[in-house]
Amino acid sequence: IAVDSRKDTDALAKVAEHATRPLTIDLQENYRLAEVVAPWVAKLRYNPGHLYHHERDRPIRDKVAYLAETAATNDCAIRIGVNCGSVDPDKLEQFPADDSISPMLASALEHCELLDDLGFERYCVSLKDSDPNKVIEANQRFAAQRPDVPLHLGVTEAGMPPDGIIKT
């Protein structure tokens, strides 16, 4: 469930009251909503590329520490959700413009290291692109470096049927 505003959190509370299965939320661009929604869900998803949108002067490590502490306090897991369309700007600058996979990989690995350093172990990673071949390559490269981290597989912006169904 995507959550990006207080209105969304109010709706989530109503959905959670009737849910018969654990819920996962996608914090979209507002990571500060984590503490509001965490009591209702089993997993928090954040996008490392979106952590730059709020409190730009606050270090990324502090933002990840807030998410890890919130998740731990509420018995939630975390998904580090790296998306080809919103990669951390600093990572994009480190690689050639025609290499879209390496910045995603660098971002995912950095955030795994941040959570590891914080002692938070209940996390998985997703590396998504609209091109299924890039998704496969990104996940294979990630798994070669971090075989200990579970992967959440999928494409982003899959599209409408039939192409969207085939990609997914």
What function would you assign to each model-found segment?
Residues V3-W40:
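N-terminal active-site wall of soluble small-molecule enzyme domains
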Residues T9-A16, A34, V64-A68, L105-E113, ...:
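Generic structural signal for well-ordered alpha-helices
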Residues L33, H53-I60, P161-G164:
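Short, charged, surface-exposed secondary-structure boundary motifs
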Residues H18-R21, A38-L44, A72-T73, F142-L151:
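Glycine-enriched alpha-helix->loop->beta-strand junction motifs that scaffold or abut catalytic
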Residues I1, R21-L27, L44-Y46, C76-V82, ...:
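Hydrophobic faces of well-ordered beta-strands that scaffold small-molecule active sites
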Residues W40-R56, G154-V155:
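Glycine-rich phosphate-binding active-site loops on the catalytic face of alpha/beta enzymes
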Residues P48-G119:
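Conserved anion-binding
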Residues N83, L92-T168:
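Catalytic alpha/beta core domains of metabolic enzymes, predominantly
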